[in-house]
Amino acid sequence: LYAPGYFEMSIRKGESIVFAASTSASKTSGLKKLFQEEVDERSPRDNFFHCLVNAAHQFHVEDKNGDAYILAGYPWFKPRARDTFISLPGLTLSIEEYEFFEAAMKTAEKGLREFMEQKPLTVKLYEIEHPDVPLWAIWAIQQYAKEAGVDKCLEKYGQLVWDILHFIKEQQHPNLTLEDNGLVKTDGKQQAVTWMNSTANGRPIVPRSGFVV
């Protein structure tokens, strides 16, 4: 039941109080240290840029294995491959956080390679089989090259880009074919294949097939 109340205590000028409320007892000797650790992890919201940084951090997640992901959205979306590559530059490079870009891309690269090698996925990156995902991956890497430099990008992701292009060129993707005109084609009649992925009765509402742009 809702039970309003208040707490009173005497403090000296300049003294700080750390208050903790929970259903179980806390070790009070460690509360101040815990509070400071939480403060240090948070972004200050004292200007517009810091507010954007704080908002971006809400989509940065890391699991117990140390794999880094971008959450597709709240309240129920999981890390999705397409959403990851589309949003990754804006949620990392734009706020000068190259390390998280590289961490999330490391996780994504593992998933991409497992998909291309037809191995079971060991990362929690969903919908990686969609035909535009490898193209968005290359686009995200291009954004990294613009910010971090071509040489560094080539060193870190050159082989991945080459392997993705080879995968597509050799017609190994289950729903992305390289045509004689040099464009890539996909079939979206049975399932949604792009970001316009709303469905009704298990079928795409907007069946996007052909040379999707």
Residue spans for each PLM region:
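Hydrophobic core/packing positions within alpha-helical solenoid repeats
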Residues: 88-91, 141, 161
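Alpha-helical support elements that line or immediately flank enzyme active sites
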Residues: 75-108
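Active-site-adjacent bridging/hinge elements
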Residues: 54-68, 105-117, 190-203
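Catalytic-loop motifs flanking and including active-site residues across diverse enzymes
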Residues: 83-86, 133-137
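Acidic/polar, glycine-enriched structural segments that form the non-catalytic walls/loops
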Residues: 1-78, 151-152, 162-173
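The feature captures the catalytic groove of carbohydrate-active enzymes
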Residues: 1-6, 10-18, 115-136, 142-159, ...
